[in-house]
A protein has these predicted regions:
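Alpha-helical solenoid repeats of the armadillo/HEAT superfamily
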Residues: 110-123, 154-177, 190, 196-227, ...
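Eukaryote-specific, cytoplasm-facing alpha-helical/coiled-coil scaffolding segments in long proteins
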Residues: 148-149, 384, 433-442, 519-532
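Cysteine-centered motifs
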Residues: 579-581, 593, 605, 622
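Short glycine-rich, low-complexity segments
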Residues: 597-598, 611
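Alpha-helical repeat/alpha-solenoid scaffolds of the HEAT/ARM/MIF4G superfamily
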Residues: 46-47, 53-57, 63-107, 155-247, ...
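N-terminal "cap/leader" segments of large eukaryotic alpha-helical scaffolds
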Residues: 1-129, 133, 170, 184, ...
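Blade-loop segments of beta-propeller domains
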Residues: 143-159
C-alpha cells in the first residue's frame, strides 16, 4: 500500500453550508423556479452524493489492497525462501564488489548497488527467528561472505553486518536450537570473527551515533559467543580484543555505555582464564586498571552505571591477582598504596579495595605484598576496619559478613606470611588497649560459631530426611552441604580460628591468657577450635594438582602445622608422618613449635619444644 497516497487523500466535501440569510434566499429562488430548474437542483444533489460514495469505495479499495500486501509479507519462512534470500545477497554483494573495482573513483556508479546490498542485509534479520536454519548460512557460504563485508570500505555496510551478527548470536536465540547454534559459532570461530571485528572497531568513530552503536553491538557479539562457548575467550583475547579493550578504557573520552560494556567484557575474558590474565599483565593491563580506578579514590561514581563500571574493573583486577606474576606487577605499580588510600578515604570504593587486598596477600605468593603493606602503615588502616564494620555498607551492595570475611582473611594472610620485625609489629597490635583486638576476635568467633551451629542443625535435619526416604548421600551431596556451610559462615570461622592459633603460638603470654579466659567465661571448649582447624586443614589446597588433589599445598602445610598445636604431643608423630607422605620430599619443611599448646590444650606446661624437620633424604623422625 502507498502510505503517502492514503495520507494525502482528501474527500470531496462539496459546497460550504450557506449562512442563514443565504439559505433563505436559496429557498425563495427554488420556490420561484420552474419544474426544470427544480430538477436541475435535484441532479446536483445526487451528483454530490455519488462523488462521496465513489470516494468511500476508493478508500476501501486502498485498505483492501494494503491487507493483501500484508498477507503476502507474512509468508512463513522456510528453507527455500532462506536459500533464495542468501542467493540474492550473494549476487548483490558480488555486483557491488565488481562495480567498486571497476569504478573506484566514481561513487555514483556503485552507490545504488550498495544500497541494494544494505537492503538485503536488513532483510536477512528474519533468519534470526529460525535458528534451525542457521546451517544454510554455513552451507551456502553466507557466513564467510558476511565476515568479508566486515572490512567493506563503507562503514555503513560493515555496521549493518555487525547488527545482523549480533541478532544471529543473541544468547536466547542460540539456546533455542543447540545444533544450529553450534554450526554457526563453529563457522564464526573458524573465520576468525573476533580478529575481523577488532579491525573494524579500529576505524569506527564513536562520535557518530551509528558507529558508536556498531561498537556496542560488536561487544555484544563477543559477549554472546563467550557465554555460549567460554573456551573461545582465549582466542578472542589473542586476536587483539584484549589490547583494544585496554586502549578503549584508557582513552580520554567521557564515560558512556560503551566504556561500561568494555569493562564488562574485560571481566568476562579474565574469568577463570590464566592465559588471558598473563596476557593482560604483559600488555601493562595492571597499570591501566589502577589508573582507571585511581579516579575513585577520592570521588564516588556519579551514576549507577559508572559504579557498575568501577565494580567491573575491581573484579578484573582481583581476577588478575590470582596469577603470581601479576602480584609482582601490582606491587611495582603501587597498587597497595592506592588500595590503602581508598580504605582511608571512606568512599564507595573502600569495600572493593578491601577485596583486592585480600586477593593480593593470600597464599605464599602474597608474601612480598604482606611485607609492603606493613611498611606503608597498612596496619593502621586495617585494624579499625577489623574492630568495627563501617556503616552504610548496604548502599554499595556489600554485607557485613563479606566485610568481616575479607578483613579476617587479610589478617590470616599477614600472620601466615610476615616474618621478623614486621610480624612483631602485627602481634603487638593484639596487645594494645588491654587486648581489645583479642576481645573483638573472640566476639567474631562466637558470632560465627552460633551461625554455624544453626546451619549444621538444618543440614543434619535434611540428611536425616534423606536417609528416611532411602536416598544415598554421596560425595557430591556432601560437597554441596560443605559449600553451604562455608557460605553460612564457616569460611570466616576457619580464618578466625587460624588467627587464634597463630597469636596464641606467638609466645605472648598476655594474648594466650586472654583467649583462655574468654573461652572459660563463655563455657566454650578448645575441642571446637581443634575440630574447625582440622576440617580447615583437610579441605585447604590450591586445586592445581589434578593428579593428586588430596596432597597438601604449601599453605595447607602451614595450616597442618597449626593443627598439630591442637592435637597434643602424643598425636604429633602420626600427623607428621601423614604430612610427609602427602607432600613432595624435597619441598617438605615443617617447623613445629608447640609452645602455644599450653593454652590451646589447657595444660600449663612451660617447656618449649622446637622440632625442625628438613627432609632431603630418607626420613628420620625423632620426637
Amino acid at each position: 500500500m502507498d502510505v503517502g497516497e492514503l495520507l494525502s487523500y482528501q474527500p470531496n466535501r462539496g459546497t460550504k453550508r450557506p449562512r442563514d440569510d443565504e439559505e433563505e434566499e436559496l429557498k425563495m429562488r427554488r420556490r420561484q423556479a420552474g419544474p426544470r430548474e427544480r430538477g436541475r437542483y435535484r441532479e446536483e444533489e445526487l451528483t454530490v452524493v455519488e462523488e462521496v460514495d465513489d470516494d468511500k469505495k476508493r478508500l476501501l479499495q486502498i485498505i483492501d489492497r494494503d491487507g493483501e500486501e500484508e498477507e503476502e509479507e507474512e509468508e512463513p519462512l522456510d528453507e527455500s525462501s532462506v536459500k533464495k534470500m542468501i542467493l540474492t545477497f550473494e549476487k548483490r554483494s558480488y555486483k557491488n564488489q565488481e562495480l567498486r573495482i571497476k569504478f573506484p573513483d566514481n561513487p555514483e556508479k556503485f552507490m545504488e548497488s550498495e544500497l541494494d546490498l544494505n537492503d538485503i542485509i536488513q532483510e536477512m534479520h528474519v533468519v534470526a527467528t529460525m535458528p534451525d536454519l542457521y546451517h544454510l548460512l554455513v552451507e551456502l557460504n553466507a557466513v564467510q561472505s558476511l565476515l568479508g563485508l566486515l572490512g567493506h570500505d563503507n562503514t555503513d555496510v560493515s555496521i549493518a553486518v555487525v547488527d545482523l551478527l549480533q541478532e544471529l548470536t543473541d544468547i536466547d536465540t542460540l539456546h533455542e536450537s543447540e545444533e544450529g547454534a553450534e554450526v554457526l559459532i563453529d563457522a564464526l570461530v573458524d573465520g576468525q570473527v573476533v580478529a575481523l571485528l577488532v579491525q573494524n572497531l579500529e576505524r569506527l568513530d564513536e562520535s557518530v551515533k551509528e558507529e558508536a552503536d556498531g561498537v556496542h553491538n560488536t561487544l555484544a557479539i563477543v559477549e554472546n559467543m563467550a557465554e555460549f562457548r567460554p573456551e573461545m575467550c582465549t582466542e578472542a583475547a589473542q586476536q587483539g580484543l584484549l589490547q583494544w579493550l585496554l586502549k578503549r578504557l584508557k582513552a580520554k573520552m567521557p564515560f558512556d555505555a560503551n566504556k561500561l560494556y568494555c569493562s564488562e567484557v574485560l571481566a568476562i575474558l579474565l574469568q577463570d582464564n590464566d592465559e588471558n590474565r598473563e596476557l593482560l599483565g604483559e600488555l601493562d593491563g595492571i597499570d591501566v586498571l589502577l589508573q582507571q580506578l585511581s579516579v575513585f579514590k577520592r570521588h564516588n561514581p556519579s551514576t549507577a552505571e559508572e559504579q557498575e563500571m568501577m565494580e567491573n574493573l575491581f573484579d578484573s583486577l582481583c581476577s588478575c591477582l590470582m596469577l603470581s606474576s601479576n602480584r609482582e606487577r601490582f606491587l611495582k605499580g603501587e597498587g597497595l598504596q592506592l588500595m590503602n588510600l581508598m580504605l582511608r578515604e571512606k568512599k564507595i570504593s573502600r569495600s572493593s579495595a578491601l577485596k583486592v587486598l585480600d586477593h593480593a596477600m593470600i597464599g605464599p605468593e602474597g608474601t612480598d605484598n604482606c611485607h609492603k603493606f606493613v611498611d606503608i602503615l597498612g596496619l593502621r588502616t586495617i585494624f579499625p576496619l577489623f574492630m568495627k564494620s563501617p556503616r552504610k555498607i548496604k548502599k554499595v551492595g556489600t554485607t557485613e559478613k563479606e566485610h568481616e570475611e575479607h578483613v579476617c582473611s587479610i589478617l590470616a594472610s599477614l600472620l601466615r606470611n610476615l616474618r621478623g620485625q614486621q610480624r612483631t609489629r602485627l602481634l603487638n597490635k593484639f596487645t594494645e588497649n588491654d587486648s581489645e583486638k583479642v576481645d573483638r576476635l573472640m566476639e567474631l568467633h562466637f558470632k560465627y560459631l552460633d551461625a554455624m551451629q544453626v546451619a549444621d542443625k538444618k543440614i543434619e535435619g535434611e540428611k536425616h530426611d534423606m536417609v528416611r526416604r532411602g536416598e544415598i548421600i554421596d560425595n557430591d551431596i556432601e560437597d554441596e552441604f560443605y559449600l553451604r556451610r562455608l557460605d553460612a559462615g564457616l569460611f570466616v570461622l576457619q580464618h578466625i580460628c587460624y588467627i587464634m592459633a597463630e597469636i596464641c603460638n606467638a609466645n605472648v603470654p598476655q594474648i594466650r591468657q586472654r583467649v583462655h579466659q574468654i573461652l572459660n567465661m563463655r563455657g566454650s571448649s578448645i575441642k571446637i577450635v581443634r575440630h574447625i582447624i582440622k576440617e580447615y586443614a583437610e579441605n585447604i589446597g590450591d586445586g592445581r594438582s589434578p593428579e593428586a588433589p588430596s596432597k597438601l599445598s604449601g599453605t595447607s602445610l602451614r595450616v597442618s602445622w597449626t593443627f598439630c598445636l591442637c592435637l597434643g604431643l602424643q598425636r604429633i608423630r602420626r600427623w607428621l608422618l601423614f604430612c610427609l607422605c602427602q607432600y613432595p620430599w624435597n619441598l617438605v619443611r615443617l617447623i613445629l613449635c608447640p609452645a602455644g599448646l599450653s593454652v590451646l590444650s589447657g595444660s600449663l606446661c612451660d617447656q618449649v619444644i622446637l622440632v625442625r624437620i628438613l627432609v632431603t633424604s630418607p626420613v628420620i623422625l625423632c620426637l
